[in-house]
Amino acid sequence: MSLAEFDADVVINAQNCIVGRVASEVAQRALGGETVAIVNVEDAVITGSEEDVMSVYETRSELGSDQGPAYPSRPDGIFKRAVRGMLPYKSDRGREALSNVRTYVGNPYDDDGEAIDGTTLDRLSNIKFLSLGEVSANLGATVTW
């Protein structure tokens, strides 16, 4: 399905927002039947020290064999995988909800998107974080953003 065919009910800007908090809100909206587009996912952040965050993602990407499980290394794939983890994706209802979610590096829409209350980075006292773009670059993804 191309961008022209995906008419999103809601466009969410993930710039400087915490990945898990945005993903949980997106999962709830998708289960409610809305089509959701998330833009600027490369600028979404994961809290924690660089060593802790990278050890988790490096372990995930190294697990499995050539046949799987495969873990994404691009920021849009990592974000969509986080949303998938919050959905019952093995049921028809969850698969339908996941098909109503699109993630984008950059912003292909004319609309800047809305920021969800309570998900921005300025609510934290912890200053240790990594953006999804930095995580992807450290995992070896080709940087195109």
Swiss-Prot record:
GO terms for molecular function: mRNA binding; structural constituent of ribosome. One of its GO terms (biological process) is translation. GO terms for cellular component: cytosolic large ribosomal subunit. Keywords: Ribonucleoprotein, Ribosomal protein. Gene3D superfamilies: Ribosomal protein L13 (3.90.1180.10). Coiled coil: none annotated. It holds the Pfam family Ribosomal_L13. It comes from the Archaea. Belongs to the universal ribosomal protein uL13 family. This protein is one of the early assembly proteins of the 50S ribosomal subunit, although it is not seen to bind rRNA by itself. It is important during the early stages of 50S assembly. NCBIfam families: L13_A_E, PRK06394.1. Part of the 50S ribosomal subunit. This is Large ribosomal subunit protein uL13. It comes from Haloquadratum walsbyi (strain DSM 16790 / HBSQ001). The lineage of its organism: Archaea, Methanobacteriati, Methanobacteriota, Stenosarchaea group, Halobacteria.
